[in-house]
């Protein structure tokens, strides 16, 4: 589940950019 959290965080940052 840790990997899912990291992936979600990366996607969120990309969306912000």
UniProtKB/Swiss-Prot annotation:
Chief place of localization: membrane
Region forming the signal peptide: none
Annotated GO biological process: adaptive immune response
UniProt KW keywords: Adaptive immunity, Cell membrane, Immunity, Membrane, Receptor, T cell receptor
Annotated compartments: Cell membrane
Domain of life: Eukaryota
GO CC terms, sorted: T cell receptor complex
Function: J region of the variable domain of T cell receptor (TR) beta chain that participates in the antigen recognition. Alpha-beta T cell receptors are antigen specific receptors which are essential to the immune response and are present on the cell surface of T lymphocytes. Recognize peptide-major histocompatibility (MH) (pMH) complexes that are displayed by antigen presenting cells (APC), a prerequisite for efficient T cell adaptive immunity against pathogens.
Subunit structure: Alpha-beta TR is a heterodimer composed of an alpha and beta chain; disulfide-linked. The alpha-beta TR is associated with the transmembrane signaling CD3 coreceptor proteins to form the TR-CD3 (TcR or TCR). The assembly of alpha-beta TR heterodimers with CD3 occurs in the endoplasmic reticulum where a single alpha-beta TR heterodimer associates with one CD3D-CD3E heterodimer, one CD3G-CD3E heterodimer and one CD247 homodimer forming a stable octameric structure. CD3D-CD3E and CD3G-CD3E heterodimers preferentially associate with TR alpha and TR beta chains, respectively.
Protein name as it appears in the record: T cell receptor beta joining 2-6
Species the sequence originates in: Homo sapiens (Human)
Lineage, broadest ranks: Eukaryota, Metazoa, Chordata, Craniata, Vertebrata
């Amino acid at each position: 589940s840790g990997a899912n959290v990291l992936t979600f965080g990366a996607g969120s940052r990309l969306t912000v950019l």
